[in-house]
Every structure is written in C-alpha cells, then in structure tokens.
Amino acid sequence: MRRPLAVVLGALLVPAALRAQGDTATFVLPNFHFADGESLAVLKLHSLTLGHPRRDASGHVANAVLILHGTGGTGRLFLNPLFTELYQPGEALDTTTHYIILPDDIGHGRSSKPSDGLRMKFPHYAYADLVTAEYRLVTEGLHVDHLLVVMGTSMGCMHSWMWAERYPDFMDGVVPLACLPTQIAGRNRMLRRMAMDAIRTDPAWQGGDYTSQPPGLRGAAEVLFFMTSAPRRLQRDFPTRDSADAEITRWMDHELATLDANDFLYQFDASRDYDPSRDLGRIKARVLAINSADDEVNPPSLDIMAQLFPKVPHGRYVLLPISDLTRGHGTHTVAAAWKQYFAPFVAGLEHSK
C-alpha cells in the first residue's frame, strides 16, 4: 500500500552508508508466462541487496532475508530510516551478517510495468504471478537456495503468507506485517473497488490510452488516504485546520506526481487471487504475524486473526496497541514499534540452525 507522506519523505533520507553498500541489479526473464495464460517476451525484475550471502557447511545460503514491499511501493521503501535501524550493527538484520534482498515487484518501481509502454495490453498479473517472479529472482537471479526469513508489508505481507504455503521448506521464518491471511473482502475490497472505479469511470482515462493522467486518479488517491491513514496520529500531528490543509496538499501533490493510472489499476486488481486461509495448516516455517490496533485496513474488530491464526502450526500473533509509535497501516515500516518481538524471533531462528 502506498505510504503516508511522512513515510515517503523519510524514504528520501537514505543513510549514506546504505547507499554505498547496496547493490542494484535487473534480472531478465525471457518469455515469462502468467497464471492466466498471458506471457511477456521480456520481464525485467529489479532488486536492491544489502550485505553478502553466507553459505553454511552444506553449501546452502544461511543468512538471506527477503523483504517484500506493499502495493504501489518499491524495495527502496525499506531504506527509510524508520526501518533501517534494523540494519545497524548488532540489530536483528545487521547488514554485516545478513544478506537483505529488496525486490521491486512486477508492475512496480524499476521492474516491468504497464506504464513502460504496453499500457492496458500489459499481462494482467495477479499475486500468484508476483510470488512466482519473486521466487525466480531469488533462486535464478541471485542464486539463493534458502531464506532465513521472508517478511513483507501490506501486499508484501500477503505475499509472505503465500511464500509460506507455496515454498514451505524454503525458509525458516515468516513475518507478515499488516495484513490478514484471507481473501480481501468487506470494506477493504469495497474501498479498493471505489479507487479503481474512480479511474475506470473517468472518460479521460480512455481505456488506458490517455496522454495525461486522468482526473479520476485524484479520487483514487483520496480513497487510499481514507483507507490507510490513522485518525489519532493525524489529529496529533496536524491539530489545526491550516496544518491539516497543508499536509493533505503536500501529500496529494506527491501522489499525483508519482502515480500512473494504469499502473495503479493493475496493482490494485492483482489481489483478486489472494486467499491463503485454506492452507494455513500446511505451513512449516515459524511465523510471527504483526498487526496494529489502529490499522483501518485490517481492523482487529473483524476478529479474523482469532479465527484463522490457530490453524498456523508454529506461529505467534502480536497485535500492537495504539501508541505514539503506531501509524495505522503504516506501522508496518516503523521498526521501533515491533522490533522487540522481531529481534528475538530472528535470533531464535538463527540459534536453531
């Protein structure tokens, strides 16, 4: 999911050491076939990596961590200082001892996407295709044969559940941040549908063949703001009419400068095949699932985790109470809010190897 403006601005403040350490690469997959039968002659998958892989006595990679971004995001989101404290010496994902993989999914960032030129003729990918591409990037592009942890935020959170079920022996641990292990329905689906309809029903969209971004894109972005923002946090940070007006103006200006209507439609339509609820009992990896009480995308009042999480054989679920650290749905990128649970989880995985 796209980020609140405070998180977006923070992502621009990338520590120099990380900029110097990170390696970027584009992995090319020829003739990539999608689950619905469509194909793409050349699929480009971009990734950023931090640290270096380390192999154990058996020759398997032992320290790789795959971190998956949310809808509309990129791997560079995890260079945000709110998250990069995890990479510091002695921290849970210390980049001197871990190999961090930060991909851009299909349809996002520097990977192949509709706005590259195909527009609505781009294959209509779904989450299953994104996970397949992630796996091929890891195994064929980066030659990693095992992951210590698969973790992700929002859409990436959902992908982490899919990884746990599709590749149950490939990772030691899974950390889904800010999602539910069931199909997107109810208010969540309705808001997504409203956002997409704001574009599709705009005559200026022209079936995807627009020459400038259609005005309906603004309405779509406004729906996302309602969907992902945290009322308590916004009231605290913008307590006057003028400050609130200034913030929403800055946020909208940034969104409209970076969004593309066709990319947006593909990104939000891709969740149509997501529903890991039936196979939760088949997960072999240890799971640490984390949500926050002020997340309006996945509100705890739905009681979905209470119903489904007991099916996970080796799991722990943490619901973070509302605090000065939580930011609604965006809490997933605020490491300080949840690293007290994450750090011992990772340490436990490493000690059990």
Sequence positions of predicted segments:
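Conserved hydrolase catalytic core segment
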Residues: 146-185
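Catalytic-loop region of hydrolases
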Residues: 21-64, 75-76, 351-353
